[in-house]
A protein has these predicted regions:
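Bacterial N-terminal signal peptides that target proteins for export
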Residues: 2-17
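Exported/periplasmic cell-wall-interacting domains
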Residues: 250-322
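Bacterial N-terminal signal peptides
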Residues: 15-25
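Gly/Pro-biased beta-strand-loop elements
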Residues: 180-283
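Sec-exported extracytoplasmic/periplasmic mature domains
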Residues: 53-60, 78-86, 97, 101-105, ...
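Extracellular LysM carbohydrate-binding repeats and other cell-envelope/extracellular binding modules
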Residues: 71-117, 159-189
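Primarily a LysM-type cell-wall glycan-binding module
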Residues: 41-75, 115-150
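Sec/Tat signal peptide C-region and signal peptidase I cleavage site
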Residues: 26-30
Length: 322
């Protein structure tokens, strides 16, 4: 029953388009929307960035917030419109803007601390050298702060053009999105749609409560299909490097334990599936999410992987479909 409801919802979502909007100081009047979003489909647009933040707060992710209109932002916005009983027109209208309502400012200021600078670390090219480290930390403050704001590193630069990237000195004030959100809902089930490279979470009533872009296996034969379930959840996991997975038939057969951290191959969260060796996990390169490039698992941006890990539990059902 729940899975049938989910299919209906996703069928509706697949037929929609996009728009723009923003809250922060308050509700924008409908007649202001066209002027405010003039040229929003071309290049970096600050109001699109703010729209992406608002959707991210609702767990409807475009992946990396970047201020650029694209298919992922369109899907997230259409989803929000449908979930709130609005036509998925892709046009900022009175009903849409009024429904979003008021909230805290979309952008906030963050000051770089000594602790931030001390939390950086190296990232060797060699797997064996990586295995000897205590953790695979962020390499630059730019990388760290971009993930903190759910941003692409390029968008972080655009918001802060005068900062000394990639490592602004301690005391530098940085503008970041405020991606704070309400308590995460419990997921009653998960649906992974391969054709749309997305992971959707539903509550026990079958209502969609989160939508995250994901990466899937490059090799179609390695893509799971059908009913699965969550078997394990591990925040900040380590990773077992198997050289045979990367170079089948090669001489190297020595497995290595790669320490945890944001630049670990599975990022900051691991959700193990009932299919041995498969999981949903984070990634050190969030900008690449949405591609068919994994070895078989499902990748999410670290911030979305952490969210999903907090929403599921052992036994949560998962359906993988085309």
């Amino acid at each position: 029953m729940v899975l049938r409801m989910m299919s209906s919802i996703q069928a509706r979502l697949a037929r929609a388009v996009l728009v723009s909007l923003i809250a922060g100081a308050g509700v924008v009047r409908a007649q202001e929307a066209p002027e405010r979003f003039a040229g929003y489909r071309s290049g970096f647009h600050r109001d699109i960035l703010e729209l992406q933040v608002l959707l991210d707060r609702k767990n409807l992710s475009c992946n990396c917030i970047d201020g650029i209109w694209g298919a992922r932002t369109e899907i997230a916005l259409q989803t929000w419109q449908l979930l709130n009983g609005l036509p998925a027109t892709g046009i900022p209208d009175a009903a849409f803007l009024e429904a979003l309502g008021r909230g805290p400012p979309v952008l906030t200021r963050y000051t770089v601390t000594e602790e931030d600078a001390a939390a950086l670390g190296p990232f060797p090219d060699d797997w064996e050298e990586r295995s000897k480290l205590p953790a695979l930390r962020y390499v630059t403050l730019q990388e760290m702060l971009a993930e903190k704001g759910h941003l692409s590193q390029r968008a972080l630069q655009r918001l802060n053009p005068d900062a000394a990237w990639p490592n602004p000195p301690v005391g530098t004030e940085i503008v970041l999105p405020d991606c704070s959100h309400d308590k995460l809902p419990q997921a009653g089930s998960i649906r992974i749609t391969l054709g749309r490279t997305e992971i959707a979470a539903y509550n026990a009533a079958g209502d969609l409560v989160a939508l995250f872009p994901c990466s899937i296996a490059r090799d179609k034969s390695r893509r799971p299909d059908g009913a699965l379930a969550v078997r394990t959840v591990a925040p900040n996991p380590n990773y077992t490097y198997d050289p045979q997975l990367f170079a089948p038939g090669g001489e190297n057969t020595v497995k290595l334990i790669i320490p945890p951290g944001p630049n670990n191959p599975v990022g900051l969260a691991w959700i193990g599936l009932s299919l041995p060796g498969y999981g949903i996990h984070g990634t050190p390169i969030p900008e690449n999410i949405g591609r068919a490039e994994s070895k078989g698992c499902f990748r999410l941006a670290n911030w979305n992987a952490v969210k999903l890990l907090q929403m599921v539990e052992t036994g949560t059902p998962i359906l993988v479909e085309e």
